[in-house]
Amino acid sequence: MESVEIHGVKAKVARTFTERARGLIGMTKPPPGEGMLILRCNAIHTFFMSYPIDAVFFDRHDRVVKEVRGIKPWRFLVWGGWKAVKVLETASTF
């Protein structure tokens, strides 16, 4: 899986349907400064997560359109808004 740097975070890039649906689910908690960038995505869930996450939603110009911190496991839907096209998931810092 390809890695990129975005918003000061080294992130693995989820491109395929399976990678995007899974996100960080089932992965060990990433250390600070690492996460997953999910492309073609404007909403996430935290089913099956074992730790809280932070999510930063970006528009097509990589501008932040929404930031949500401390999303607990088993949350149904976190929506980034109509302009969001990708989301960066990291382990929560809160």
Roles of regions detected by a PLM:
Residues 1-94:
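Compact, glycine-rich, soluble single-domain proteins
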